[in-house]
Amino acid sequence: MNTKMRAALTVEKRVAIALWKLATPDSYRSVGNQFGVGKSTVGAAVMQVAHAIKDLLISRVVTLGNVQVIVDGFAAMGFPNCGGAIDGTHIPILAPEHQAAEYINRKGYFSIVLQALVNHKGRFTNINVGWPGKVHDARIFRNSGLFQKLQEGTLFPDQKITVGDVEMPICILGDPANAMAHEAVHRQPGQ
């Protein structure tokens, strides 16, 4: 929005500022000097672009895709009937003003958690980001949309393989913190 003092930043300039800030270790002040704006304007541009990416692009880019291709890809690597691999990672952040203690992870630094499900090529098929670093991976998974879809039986089609006399549904590879994925996949909808 234009004001009496200056014209509003164009979308192109906002995106350029955000990309520059996200791609370099430069401070907000340095990026602001580069583009002729204040550091608070840099912060606002980064947040606006990040929200636009989240709202408009994530659902188009981070998708499950063709489940059979994923299952075949994992089978070629020795993991039959696998629909993905899940894990979490900590993204370092500056200490927030409020509830800072909630963001200190087990390694002692401030972070937010990214939980991701990837396909056989390591491409994201589901992400959940933003939980405070102190929160355990199992709790994050239990409260994720991915867990809900697994519980409802809507993430993977009703595809099973038979090993001996046992029918096995599609599974997800993960560490012990994500052991609940096993239960969620194997539970029938409505149980």
Residues of each region from the PLM?
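Short, well-ordered secondary-structure "scaffold" segments embedded in the functional core
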Residues: 27-191
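Short, amphipathic alpha-helical "recognition" segments used to contact nucleic acids or chromatin
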Residues: 11-24
